[in-house]
């Protein structure tokens, strides 16, 4: 278990627990045209063969990935929302090597977009709902209503929730976005529907720090 999870501490501001995993570009048409499917693309990212065929970043050896070139200012901002960045975990190196480097993304722009969107979600009705129900069992329908209040009813289908355990604990939230809107503040037009809502069922627990 990563030390940032094991050593997690309580915070009076519960939105602090809404953290970033990454920003993953979908399969580009130019790469799909070379016979690559979505599943292979999401597994290998920039290391996908025959293209882009860059060095593979391994999840078990994140710190072996090249440094990102992120500025000190950018790194400080990222560290506040991505607990696995820097330190002994090197999550930001892994994420950039797998999902960013083959697009030539400027590291400060790429990670800066993650930081900005994280703040926008935290300040939304959906973020406030998660914070206000910290440690509690909630209904999926109430979560969906908070998302709809934030960005409109059509945005609900963009949220895929992953849960583990019995009772079901919310462990991840994947949000599907339109690439053309990525540099704009989140709005009704930002979201793209996903085919599956996730495995969380009708209710789930919003976990809290500690065991």
Segments the model singles out, each with a brief description of its role:
Residues 4-211:
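Domain-level detector of nuclease and nuclease-like folds
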